[in-house]
Regions:
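Active-site-proximal alpha-helix that buttresses catalytic centers in soluble enzyme cores
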Residues: 1-269
Length: 269
């Protein structure tokens, strides 16, 4: 890493990962965007999924590529002597992957679990290590994202002609550690304030699967149980004949290709 180091400040991006070439291209663009936005900072990308790391290395769907987990990168960052460290999650909502980043990788680094760093260096990092939250960490983030999505030219054109559905990932039951699933409902609510043709579904959050979105389009009152919270949404019957699907994920990887784009699945119906 010392050969790559240009600054004493570093941003470590953490994504779940992927095994799709288009996703790798997007990750490269994300890294470039961060470098452009935060000049004077070094920027690196890590994958938190061992499966994605191993499959990328084996060349599944693409030429072999080397990616490393956050522990590998944080160790290298510490050994390189960086003085300001930002670990930025690329997740959409807080869930299992974000919890692992914050409560495992970063915590182990700050506790010098493996004894890789001197006490002097660790003391120098006091208040100099920051963990960036996911895209929709707070409800206000969902509101801001709704406005941003609605301002996208292709989305604005599509929703003016018919249904627009965003497909997120969601936390499966038992893994919604921070109540992050509620953000999808809040996002949908804010989007529908802008245009009732908007819908939000997921691949893993109960009551927001593809078949649930179809029922929402048919209209009715729906109660969502999210942890200890109840959330109610009212939908009018939508008779639109056109529809457009968009992935609500940091990259278009396996879910976008095999869940959303599969003609045999409801998300593509």
């Amino acid at each position: 890493m010392n050969t790559q180091k240009k600054s004493n400040k570093v941003i470590q991006l953490v994504a779940f990962g992927s095994t799709w070439e288009q996703a790798y291209d997007t990750f490269d663009k994300v890294v470039d965007d961060y470098k452009a936005q935060f000049s004077g900072w070094d920027v690196y990308l890590s994958f938190s999924s061992a499966i994605c790391i191993n499959n990328a290395r084996a060349g599944e769907n693409v030429d072999p590529k080397d990616y490393y987990d956050p522990e590998h990168w944080l160790t290298a960052i510490g050994l390189a002597g960086y003085q300001q460290i930002v670990v930025q999650s690329l997740q959409v909502i807080p869930g299992e992957e974000y919890r692992r980043v914050r409560d495992s990788y970063v915590k182990d680094f700050m506790n010098n679990r493996n004894g890789d760093f001197s006490d002097k260096y660790m003391k120098s990092l006091d208040r100099q290590v920051v963990v960036g939250t996911p895209l929709m960490a707070e409800e206000s983030d969902a509101k801001a994202l709704a406005q941003t999505l609605n301002n996208e030219a292709d989305v604005k054109a599509a929703v003016a002609e018919g249904i627009v559905t965003f497909m997120g990932h969601g936390n499966p039951e038992g893994y919604d550690y921070y109540g992050g699933n509620i953000r999808y409902l809040q996002l949908e609510s804010y989007l529908r304030e802008l245009n009732p043709n908007y819908y939000v579904g997921t691949v893993d959050m109960d009551q927001t699967y593809a078949e649930d979105v179809v029922e929402h389009i048919k209209g009715g009152k729906f109660n969502f149980a999210v942890g200890d919270m109840m959330y109610t949404m009212n939908y009018d019957v939508n008779l639109s004949k056109k529809g457009q699907l968009y992935p609500l994920m940091s990259i278009a990887g396996d879910h976008a290709h095999n869940d959303m784009a599969d003609e045999d699945l409801l998300y593509s119906a």
